[in-house]
Amino acid sequence: FNWYSFAIFFIQPAVFSAVAMILSRAAENQAPNLVYSVIGSGILGMWSGLVFSSTYDIRADRREGTLELIVGSPTSLRKVEAIRTLSNVLTGLVSLAAAFVAAVLIFDYPLAQVNAIMAIGSLFLLLFGLWSMGIFLANFLVWSRLSGSMVDFLELPVAVFCGFMYPLHILPVWMQNISMIFPIRWALQSLQAAFLGEVFQPQTWMNWSISLAISIVFCLVSTWLDVKVHDMIRKTGEMSSI
C-alpha cells in the first residue's frame, strides 16, 4: 500500500473539495456548485497525481542509477515515459471516479441532465491532453535535476489558469489568453458543459478540435526534443552535457 499515492489521489482532492464547499457556504450559496467543487477537485487530483508521480519516477531512476541505463537502452526514453505517463493518467482516473461517486451518493447529484456522449468524448480528450503534457514535462526532468523544481511548481498555476474549480470567464483576459496553450483547458470546458447538461454546439466541436491539435503539438515537440537529446547524450557520453 502506497500512502503517497493515496494522499495525492484521494486525500488532496477531498481537501480541495471541502475548501471549495466551505467557501461556497461562506458566500451564502444555498448549495455548492458540484461541477466545480466536486468534479473539479477530481480533475485537480488527476493533474497533481500526474505531476508528482512523473517527477518521482525520474528522481527514483536517478537515485537508483537506472536513468543512464534507460537512456542508453535500445528502447527509447520516449517510449518508457509514454507508458509510465499513461499509467499515471489512468491511475488519476481514480480521483475523478471518487469525486463522481461522492457527487452522486453524498450530494445526490442528478444524472439525468448529464450529456453522457459529450462527457465521454471530453474526458477522452482530457486524458490525452494530460498524457501529452506529461511526456513533454518528463523530458525536462531527464535533462536537468533543477527542472524538477520547475515542474513541481506547475501544479497550482496550471490549475488556476485552466479553471479546474471555477469558470474561466472570471479570470482576467491576460490569464485566459495564457490558458489557451494548455489542451486540458479546452477539454475541461466541454466536460464541465456536459455535466451541466448542455447539448452539442459549434463551440463544443471547436473546443475538441483545439484540445486535440494542441495535444498533438505537445507530442510532436516531445518527440523532436527526445531525438535531439538522445543524439547529444550518445555523442558526449554525459547526461550533464545538456
List each model region and its residues.
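Hydrophobic transmembrane alpha-helices and immediately adjacent juxtamembrane helices
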Residues: F1-I242
